[in-house]
């Protein structure tokens, strides 16, 4: 079984479980909503006009798994070719962890990805990327509400004034910290090794530390998935923001026509 098929079957098993626990039912609901966003994104832009922001963190990894599931469901044996043609943009922190770079390289090899690494500040990085990939109109982003500037985001929105123009597609906004880890563990997906050393939110070396809430009496740290209070996810980062469980204002069932009205041309 190849890696894409493994991911597809592991998510399919969540949907088809004969006696799902309360946790799995919640995960089924969360998956269903996000997959509708992803379906609309791929139907509107087609894989040829989409890119994905990917730094190897847990959130973009979950979004990536959902995209694999959709591509396998839609394109069957052609899913790998579709996936390999999508540009994955890795905006590298100035002081990145070697483990993050190693994990991105591992994903590139394992899933046969077209990863484009850019060592510039975020805005300049996307300016450079879009200048070199003029056909790209929309970018999938694994932002969640706990992230800085994530609280009032919506699933589909054009970039802010002053940024290069593209459609931001943000299908996992309302996933909780626990739900992110539930999916990664349920699908037995390999993740960046830093998470097993107590890091719960990854940035650069200078602004990221193991989460103090996971520190053990002997000075070691428990794995990230054992953090019980999701509001402490960014406790190892600067500029933490409180978590608010707010449903997206841009729900799929509000009508697909409202998406098209703000489509990037």
Swiss-Prot record:
It catalyses: FMN + ATP + H(+) = FAD + diphosphate. InterPro entries: PAPS_reduct_dom, Rossmann-like_a/b/a_fold. The keyword Transferase applies. One of its GO terms (molecular function) is FMN adenylyltransferase activity. Its EC number is 2.7.7.2. It comes from the Eukaryota. GO terms for biological process: FAD biosynthetic process; FMN metabolic process. Pathway: Cofactor biosynthesis; FAD biosynthesis; FAD from FMN: step 1/1. Belongs to the PAPS reductase family. FAD1 subfamily. Adenylates FMN to FAD. This is Probable FAD synthase. It comes from Schizosaccharomyces pombe (strain 972 / ATCC 24843) (Fission yeast).
